[in-house]
């Protein structure tokens, strides 16, 4: 059992990251985490630990600024990926994962039941495809501040969607037969089959810009809430650990099927309330994820079970249930925020001094 990261060690990590980033870093190199006071309540402590785990995972990505930064770019890269910085992140990561993601995985594993993956698929797909509406969007439809809330939804979603499929790309590295090729075909769909303007993260950037938001990766990371961080980190725990290969399949099974309905609801919401907004990101997913679910079931789940027997089935189910849990927490958090603002007479709206550039150069 790994011991949790101490407050002293976490604050030392934060100081290391701040030193490497320097003052006023471009978003690509901003790795800020909040300092953790000795008397922090558990919710704040968990939030800051999730911030640190976010930075552990982001450290494995190639992220470059949209325009040349002040100073020497190569020197910036040397600092950002420096040995001391990477060593500190790599030392903290397994402890943070055990503390933050471990309990979520235990709950998902307990929900996996008898491990019959094909029976689970037969239940799951009709269940998700029968979802009639999104409670968050239903609440927005009746709220006069729907644009502000939707901007926050986009801001929070940018944690994953501005680097969409980069996490799952780590799940196709190696050699594991025909299912690997099927997963790669799903991946290259997300990357627009090499046509940059069709890459899903580029489509999402256009949606951000249409709402007047900065579209730089990591641009709003200091505003990510706890549910956003938990969702991001659970997904990256799945895909940044090769041990989780069958659990990753469970994520894809749930996510690709759930997106068929959720993205359709978002496309309809934008068409009704924000017809001027760029909605291609959502319309594209509502269509293509129908094919992705079929590919996951027929070209990944079934071949794995035929090859290895029922053993991987339980992990596939648990991966799907972990995904269900973190998706539900994220959605519930957005809905609770709407209700909290509605109950607060003096709520302030807008980003205020936290706003970045109106639009990052495309």
What are these regions (language model features)?
Residues 1-362:
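Non-heme di-metal
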